[in-house]
Amino acid sequence: MVQAKAGFKAGVQDYRLTYYTPDYTPKDTDLLACFRMTPQPGVPAEEAAAAVAAESSTGTWTTVWTDNLTDLDRYKGRCYDLEAVPNEDNQYFAFIAYPLDLFEEGSVTNVLTSLVGNVFGFKALRALRLEDIRFPVALIKTFQGPPHGITVERDKLNKYGRPLLGCTIKPKLGLSAKNYGRAVYECLRGGLDFTKDDENINSQPFMRWRDRFLFVQEAIEKAQAETNEMKGHYLNVTAGTCEEMMKRAEFAKEIGTPIIMHDFFTGGFTANTTLARWCRDNGILLHIHRAMHAVVDRQKNHGIHFRVLAKCLRLSGGDHLHSGTVVGKLEGERGITMGFVDLMREDYVEEDRSRGIFFTQDYASMPGTMPVASGGIHVWHMPALVEIFGDDSCLQFGGGTLGHPWGNAPGATANRVALEACVQARNEGRNLAREGNDVIREACRWSPELAAACELWKEIKFEFEAMDTL
């Protein structure tokens, strides 16, 4: 029988005696996390922050004698800094450093299980939100990242110098496979680069996945032949099991599709990483939808900020990721949105608190993920979208294409004309933020499709105060 070491003292002691270390200087190899923390009344901020560090690393609620069988100083998380949140009562930013050895190589699943596991139900906290993570380069290098990345995607598609243009097929549910393929063809023939399955299209009684894949691929090939442009459709391979997901991906490869899609949050990071690695091995692009993200990222004081999910998805693997629009129907303040957009596609991003970036992040040359602006956007938004997101983005219109009064193909043409006009105006030195509406009106003179779209949506706005603010 193993005996406890002499000197072991059973009982409960304050977390801060072990896990609050304000004199600690983080190492380059540490994983750093920033939590927005709201302690329960009467709980000191230092104790609450130390509790977060403990419960997300080596600690438990009482002293255990097996602590003596390891080196806690080597493995414990440490709260090294604590800041009051400006303009908020009883809220604090707790900065915690975690040793590299706490995490399995190449596993987003393991990182999140530690950082946002049981600690979020801790009674000493009224609320807790993971605001940001700094992944050390030593850990970054164990991840594959996006299957291909922005540069390789452009080379595959032979499309340069402008944002990519897409459309989500609507109605999202209820179409037969043949009618679905017809809508895909009309949109691609009208001028779009991509069309897309909506997130909840999988394999339902009204349209089984195999039928959809075949009719969609026929539409892609027909549109490519008629336009002499590379086209694609995001075939959603998300399924109830990983085995079924991979079966659908293999079939998509067999019929020649260039890109597939996964709902990463509902499907899970393990499934997503598996699919991303397969996509790189098989030369298939991977579009990622973020369905369910707002359940955990929309509340300001509890959950996980989307910038964390975006970083994790880039490591797990995805060539596209939905990122909000700033100007459409979905949540997203400009500074915050562009902060995590840069974290998706840039190789090195400096700390910038004004944009919600709490740590400098070096991705060590990992390929970037292209942001997808989608949700309640139409032709009048085009100048702002081009000005905000730049060329390395995908502008994804659903109702803003299929809602055109003349049909799907004219709707696609209207969007393509608006995009080309805005890119040309920008390249000529015009300021889209000031002159965007004039650019669109000028283009309407020679595009009746665009003129009809502008007339239809001239009064449509989504003006609600953003909740995602600093």
From Swiss-Prot:
Record's GO cellular component terms: carboxysome
Residues the record lists as N6-carboxylysine modifications: K196
Any Pfam family the entry gives: RuBisCO_large_N
Annotated site location: Transition state stabilizer: K329
InterPro entries given in the database record: RuBisCO (IPR033966), RuBisCo_large_chain_AS (IPR020878), RuBisCO_lsu_C (IPR000685), RuBisCO_lsu_C_sf (IPR036376), RuBisCO_lsu_fd_N (IPR017443), RuBisCO_lsu_N_sf (IPR036422), RuBisCO_lsuI (IPR020888)
PROSITE patterns according to UniProt: RUBISCO_LARGE
GO MF entry, a single one: ribulose-bisphosphate carboxylase activity
Binding site for Mg(2+): K196, D198, E199
Record PTM: The disulfide bond which can form in the large chain dimeric partners within the hexadecamer appears to be associated with oxidative stress and protein turnover.
A GO BP entry: photorespiration
Swiss-Prot/TrEMBL catalytic activity: 2 (2R)-3-phosphoglycerate + 2 H(+) = D-ribulose 1,5-bisphosphate + CO2 + H2O; D-ribulose 1,5-bisphosphate + O2 = 2-phosphoglycolate + (2R)-3-phosphoglycerate + 2 H(+)
Domain of life of the source: Bacteria
General function of this protein: RuBisCO catalyzes two reactions: the carboxylation of D-ribulose 1,5-bisphosphate, the primary event in carbon dioxide fixation, as well as the oxidative fragmentation of the pentose substrate in the photorespiration process. Both reactions occur simultaneously and in competition at the same active site.
Additional remarks: The basic functional RuBisCO is composed of a large chain homodimer in a 'head-to-tail' conformation. In form I RuBisCO this homodimer is arranged in a barrel-like tetramer with the small subunits forming a tetrameric 'cap' on each end of the 'barrel'.
Assigned protein family: Belongs to the RuBisCO large chain family. Type I subfamily.
Subunit structure: Heterohexadecamer of 8 large chains and 8 small chains; disulfide-linked. The disulfide link is formed within the large subunit homodimers. RuBisCO interacts with the C-terminus of CcmM, and can be found in complexes that also include carbonic anhydrase (ccaA). RuBisCO associates with both the internal and shell portion of carboxysomes.
The protein's name: Ribulose bisphosphate carboxylase large chain
Organism: Synechocystis sp. (strain ATCC 27184 / PCC 6803 / Kazusa)
Gene (UniProt): cbbL
